[in-house]
Regions:
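Hydrophobic faces of well-ordered beta-strands that scaffold small-molecule active sites
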Residues: 1, 22-24, 57-61, 97-99, ...
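N-terminal pre-domain/capping segments
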Residues: 1-61, 65, 69-84
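Alpha-helix capping and helix-coil boundary motifs
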Residues: 6-9, 105-108, 177
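Active-site acidic/histidine proton-transfer and metal-coordination neighborhood
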Residues: 67-164
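Conserved small/polar residues in nucleotide/adenosyl-binding loops
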Residues: 169-176
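Cytosolic catalytic cores of cyclic-nucleotide second-messenger enzymes
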Residues: 180
Length: 180
């Protein structure tokens, strides 16, 4: 859903569609800018959610992040975005933040898995309320998350497992011939 008109307006549009949940982008999906919401906007958004019995809301992190990158600048950018977005989603009372694990860019899936899990151990906090979801990937090129085994390898290394989950994207799993 577009949040161009604000979170409350987006929630109103969801109600008009007879839906009870929504997915938004945490910020510009192809960049790094994000909107700051006034407390009144957040209160209005949460009131609409409560009044219409919304289920959990999902925010998607930008596509431009690569948590498995060997390039320090790219990796640090991704760490900053995830850290900021967890804090922001907690403030907005948005329950879930999903992200693409990234591409290992030739250094190997095992190294990509190590980088992702180390980053998650660094930024996840016991007091956070937002659950972070790893999204299944198609496995094109050097993408990490092409199999449930790769996602499991990341989750096994994360210390705060109760703050983690997997977002299963059927189309991507189908592209890799993954079976449930």
């Amino acid at each position: 859903m577009s949040i161009a008109g604000g979170l409350a307006k987006t929630a109103e549009n969801v109600v008009k569609m007879n839906a009870d949940t929504m997915q938004i982008f945490s910020r510009n999906p192809r960049g790094s800018s994000y909107k700051t919401y006034l407390p009144e906007e957040i209160e209005r958004f949460q009131k609409i959610r409560k009044d219409h019995a919304f289920g959990p809301v999902l925010a998607h992190a930008p596509y431009t992040m690569n948590l498995a990158s060997a390039t320090e600048k790219t990796y640090e950018f991704a760490c900053t975005v995830i850290r900021e977005d967890i804090r922001r989603m907690d403030e907005l009372q948005i329950e879930n933040l999903v992200f693409h694990p990234g591409s290992h860019t030739g250094q190997g899936a095992e190294e990509g898995i190590r980088l992702i899990s180390e980053m998650l151990n660094e930024i996840l906090k016991p007091e956070q309320t937002t659950t972070v979801l790893l999204e299944t990937m198609a496995g094109k090129g050097t993408e990490v998350g092409r199999s449930f085994e790769e996602l499991a390898a990341i989750l096994e290394r994360v210390e705060l497992k109760d703050h983690m989950a997997v977002s299963y994207t059927h189309l991507r799993a189908h592209e890799t011939s993954a079976h449930l």
